[in-house]
């Protein structure tokens, strides 16, 4: 996962979108300038009319646009907010600074869902569904996004049959996720899962302290953990080598 692709959430009409196409997974999404629509919000208009000290950068825009995959022609639709920002330059011929404004925008909704990392195909369906739900929230609500990631860990514990309740005095008491992770059978990723859980906890508390980089780093940890569980390259390489050595030649194919 290239974290630099996802820490950037502010774009212009000339930006390059290094996102994977939802359909073919290639990085071939291209911004369609003729499909880009902006409209000043009514609140922004009212503020502009009532304030003499108003400046153009204070405009708030609702935006909509499309990206099209050059490889498979899938179209991705997005909505968001934006505002004009000055990108002036010094003109040597005029010997003066020339003011130019460009619309910067941030998507708050993207459809079809962009996957921030590739989920292994052998990952349990319920875990996959919860992670995809978090991808949808990444653009608009980081706290809810983090909470979805945390829920995916709860489901992962269920899939691995990690004890969910303790019984005492005839009562069934839920076991905290932290303690369930400590009992997770794949000890090599326990610390990874605990780190993911802590960020998920922050989202659950609605503290508004989370930043985009926090979620992106958490996705990096989650990607690593899932690959170790369901797409262990090292284990596959060792398996291939073992089969070749046992046959003293090429592996048997189906």
Regions found by a protein language model. Give the residues of each.
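A long, hydrophobic alpha-helical segment
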Residues: 124-142
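Charge-enriched, short contiguous segments at helix-coil
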Residues: 191-246
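Helix-loop junctions and short alpha-helical segments
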Residues: 68-126
